[in-house]
């Protein structure tokens, strides 16, 4: 079990200890469930009541919240960021693989850096390059001519098609498929003609891709996911999309082909983005937003209908269908009112 003193944490987080700085911390927990030896945090005032009753040995607090707290605290600028840093430090998540399993199938042309680990029944294709300390989980398949940067971790049953490049310090979760064909077809007299998808996928450093997400390869050029992007579970990224640095995309979102999303965007869950659009830096889409046009300015955008009583929803649905008729009636009334007698 890992452990660290509050004094050591204060140096890591540039914080100030309020209480016993020799106190030893071995894990993190919520205010409600923390016990001795654990550190918790208060980042939302609605949990203030739990602060008074917590059994945590120490709590990460802002300077304001620490003023009236009688227990041991580590005062930091942002308690939630502090919690994330401590959680990383004390993380006990097992590795995706240890050593190279004898059942792994590794092409002789593949290049493996120092410290590479490959799990059972994994397949490493021709001309693949794995950087130092890469972890390849059991059953994962890496297609030919792919490159994976150092310290990147692929969990079990990930599939990388050919010509996929991953940067350093990435995490790819189970079931993710990267580099499958984009949805490219031409229609000739009612029959679909497949367009070979000859591009690849280029993923930067510190990217995390959630379970069962799919990222299509480019039709001609590459699909690009830039540094620091985080993608939740069950997200679809289509061919030739470009996602800017440090953008976050929540689960069940679908992005059609040839979309360019800027830097530092937040895309809520279950959003749908039509193809060939541009979304500016700093755009925030709330959950279930349907994007059908370019977004040139940063800001918060929404389009989903919120939940309501079913009977009210039925009435409003009927009224929505009558909007055009109502508009024409109002327009006619206005015209008559403005007509001189």
From Swiss-Prot:
Alphabetized Gene3D superfamilies for the sequence: 1.20.5.170, Hexapeptide repeat proteins, MurE/MurF, N-terminal domain
PROSITE patterns according to UniProt: HEXAPEP_TRANSFERASES (PS00101)
Alphabetical keyword list: Acyltransferase, Lipid A biosynthesis, Lipid biosynthesis, Lipid metabolism, Repeat, Transferase
Recorded metabolic or biological pathway in which this protein acts: Bacterial outer membrane biogenesis; LPS lipid A biosynthesis
Gene Ontology biological process terms from the UniProt entry: lipid A biosynthetic process
GO cellular component, one term: membrane
Catalytic activity annotation: a UDP-3-O-[(3R)-3-hydroxyacyl]-alpha-D-glucosamine + a (3R)-hydroxyacyl-[ACP] = a UDP-2-N,3-O-bis[(3R)-3-hydroxyacyl]-alpha-D-glucosamine + holo-[ACP] + H(+)
Transmembrane annotation, as ranges: none
Pfam families linked: Hexapep (PF00132), Hexapep_2 (PF14602), LpxD (PF04613)
EC number: 2.3.1.191
Record has Acyltransferase as a keyword: yes
Coiled-coil region(s): none
First-level EC class: transferase
Presence of the UniProt keyword RNA-binding in the record: no
InterPro entries: Hexapep, LpxD, Trimer_LpxA-like_sf, UDP_GlcNAc_AcTrfase_non-rep
An example molecular function term from Gene Ontology annotations: N-acyltransferase activity
Active site per the UniProt annotation: 239
Matches recorded under NCBIfam families: lipid_A_lpxD, PRK00892.1
Similarity section: Belongs to the transferase hexapeptide repeat family. LpxD subfamily.
Subunit comment: Homotrimer.
PANTHER family: UDP-3-O-ACYLGLUCOSAMINE N-ACYLTRANSFERASE (PTHR43378), UDP-3-O-ACYLGLUCOSAMINE N-ACYLTRANSFERASE 1, MITOCHONDRIAL-RELATED (PTHR43378:SF2)
Task of the protein: Catalyzes the N-acylation of UDP-3-O-acylglucosamine using 3-hydroxyacyl-ACP as the acyl donor. Is involved in the biosynthesis of lipid A, a phosphorylated glycolipid that anchors the lipopolysaccharide to the outer membrane of the cell.
Name of the featured protein: UDP-3-O-acylglucosamine N-acyltransferase
């Amino acid at each position: 079990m890992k452990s660290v003193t509050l004094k050591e944490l204060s140096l890591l987080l540039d914080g100030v200890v309020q209480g016993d700085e020799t106190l030893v911390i071995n894990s993190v927990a919520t205010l409600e469930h923390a016990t001795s030896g654990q550190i918790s945090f208060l980042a939302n005032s609605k949990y203030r009541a739990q602060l008074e009753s917590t059994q945590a040995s120490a709590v990460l607090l802002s300077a304001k919240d620490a003023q009236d707290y009688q227990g041991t605290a580590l005062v930091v600028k942002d308690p939630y960021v502090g919690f994330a840093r401590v959680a990383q430090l004390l993380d006990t998540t097992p590795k995706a693989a240890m050593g190279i399993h004898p059942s792994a199938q590794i092409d002789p042309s593949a290049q493996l850096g120092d410290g590479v680990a490959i799990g059972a029944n994994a397949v490493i294709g021709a001309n693949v390059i794995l950087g130092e300390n890469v972890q390849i989980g059991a059953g994962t398949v890496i297609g030919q001519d792919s490159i994976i940067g150092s310290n990147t971790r692929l969990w079990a049953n990930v599939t990388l098609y050919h010509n996929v490049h991953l940067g350093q310090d990435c995490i790819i979760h189970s079931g993710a498929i990267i580099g499958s064909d984009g949805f490219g077809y031409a229609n000739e007299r009612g029959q679909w003609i497949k367009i070979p998808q000859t591009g690849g996928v280029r993923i930067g450093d510190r990217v995390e891709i959630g379970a069962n997400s799919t990222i299509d390869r480019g039709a001609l050029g590459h699909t690009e996911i830039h540094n620091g992007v985080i993608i939740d579970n069950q997200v679809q990224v289509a061919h030739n999309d470009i996602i800017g640095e440090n953008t976050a995309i929540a689960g069940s979102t679908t992005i059609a082909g040839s979309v360019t999303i800027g830097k530092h965007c937040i895309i809520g869950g279950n959003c749908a983005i039509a193809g060939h659009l541009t979304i500016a830096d700093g755009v925030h889409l709330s959950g279930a937003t349907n994007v059908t046009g370019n977004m040139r300015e940063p800001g918060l955008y929404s389009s989903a209908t919120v939940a309501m009583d079913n009977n009210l929803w039925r009435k409003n649905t009927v009224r929505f269908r009558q909007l055009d008729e109502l508009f024409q009636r109002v327009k006619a009334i206005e015209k008559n009112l403005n007509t001189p007698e």
